């Protein structure tokens, strides 16, 4: 059954594993996450997967919520998502990672703000 109206999916995640960008998923023995076991998540999840999983819906746009990227370089996730959007058309908007206790938080926020799909942190 296809939904008869367009939907903005306001919370999803994309990731490509194997590059050390997701310490919580790429550990040698990933521990259960606060939301449960991580075993079902131990694979890449990219726009093609998302389109397959949402094929029954009229997705008008989607919002990627930061996926606990390696906090050593939070701008890298925003940059990767913009490259992904340019190549694949998704996500439509990005909520980025920012840790306010960082000494360089002003630079991190300015860096995120430079990306046009950014909508918040």
Spans of model-derived segments:
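Helix-coil boundary/capping segments in enzymes
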Residues: 1-121
């Amino acid at each position: 059954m296809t939904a008869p109206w367009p939907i903005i999916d306001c919370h999803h995640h994309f990731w490509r594993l194997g590059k050390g960008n997701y310490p919580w998923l790429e550990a040698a023995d990933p521990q259960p996450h606060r939301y449960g076991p991580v075993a079902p998540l131990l694979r890449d999840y990219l726009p093609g997967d998302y389109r397959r999983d949402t094929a029954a819906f009229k997705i008008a746009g989607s919002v990627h919520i930061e996926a606990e990227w390696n906090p050593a370089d939070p701008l890298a996730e925003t940059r990767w998502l913009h490259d992904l959007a340019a190549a694949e058309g998704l996500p439509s908007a990005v909520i980025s990672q920012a840790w306010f206790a960082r000494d360089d938080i002003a630079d991190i926020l300015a860096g995120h703000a430079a990306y046009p799909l950014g909508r918040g942190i």
